[in-house]
């Protein structure tokens, strides 16, 4: 009975920890949309949202009310079940990666032995949301956007996986906490700089962030694969994009920048500050870079990212052998 009570306490504590982290990430993703709009306004020397509340502080509430009260319309010509399922997959696929990321040495929900492989699996799953959304909408622009997203994601996931193999080889483990502990004396970004560079580029592509947002380019495809979505279904796609930004930023910090490791201040503060830096970098990239052509995006991946990733693997193998 004592054993059963101890297990029930552990399960209950883990359950509330999962709920707390997931709610925190969803709320942070919603807030990130307002932060991005304000920062883009600063970069472009214009006013951002500043009408609702003090300095636009209540703009998020206004946006949520607008989305909740919009008509939740399903096109009569769509494949309804898949049409409804797609935003749910987009919202949950990379959100499920958050529980395997250690926030501190003592605060991790699930410390998987195959944490890296689990992330790659969930990143691959996210492309199905876009494929299903474009196909089930029965709209030519949505289908073109879905086709672009599939080719782009499948191409850059090759580099996403290969860029992490150097980190895995150097730390000797697929377990994310072991990778963080292996950076006690030197961060992986120094011996694995080319791997970090490729992972950052591939992470932008997997998140479909600028300059890799061809699947939803407004000027060419009229918002691409979610052209037929409205209301909360569109909101799930919208929040899912920001969840993917937080997830990829957390993984960059964990795998290449020592995770929670840092001097003087508490480890959780270090982890959050590093994540904020890379989120700011994602927004700065959107503000600074133009959108290239679709064929240029694919050629850049195969002609630049693939050789760079292979060079990083050979260099890592050489350093390990020496």
UniProtKB/Swiss-Prot annotation:
The keyword Membrane applies. It catalyses: a quinone + NADH + 5 H(+)(in) = a quinol + NAD(+) + 4 H(+)(out). GO terms for molecular function: NADH dehydrogenase activity; oxidoreductase activity, acting on NAD(P)H, quinone or similar compound as acceptor; quinone binding. Its main location: membrane. Disulfide bonds: none annotated. It is a multi-pass membrane protein. One of its GO terms (cellular component) is plasma membrane. It comes from the Bacteria. Keywords: Cell membrane, Membrane, NAD, Quinone, Translocase, Transmembrane, Transmembrane helix, Ubiquinone. Its EC number is 7.1.1.-. The chain crosses the membrane at residues 15-35, 50-69, 81-101, 114-134, 149-169, 186-206, 237-257, 265-285, 302-322. InterPro entries: NADH_UbQ_OxRdtase_su1/FPO, NADH_UbQ_OxRdtase_su1_CS. Belongs to the complex I subunit 1 family. PANTHER family: NADH DEHYDROGENASE SUBUNIT 1 (PTHR11432), NADH-UBIQUINONE OXIDOREDUCTASE CHAIN 1 (PTHR11432:SF3). NDH-1 is composed of 13 different subunits. Subunits NuoA, H, J, K, L, M, N constitute the membrane sector of the complex. NDH-1 shuttles electrons from NADH, via FMN and iron-sulfur (Fe-S) centers, to quinones in the respiratory chain. The immediate electron acceptor for the enzyme in this species is believed to be ubiquinone. Couples the redox reaction to proton translocation (for every two electrons transferred, four hydrogen ions are translocated across the cytoplasmic membrane), and thus conserves the redox energy in a proton gradient. This subunit may bind ubiquinone. This is NADH-quinone oxidoreductase subunit H. It comes from Buchnera aphidicola subsp. Acyrthosiphon pisum (strain APS) (Acyrthosiphon pisum symbiotic bacterium).
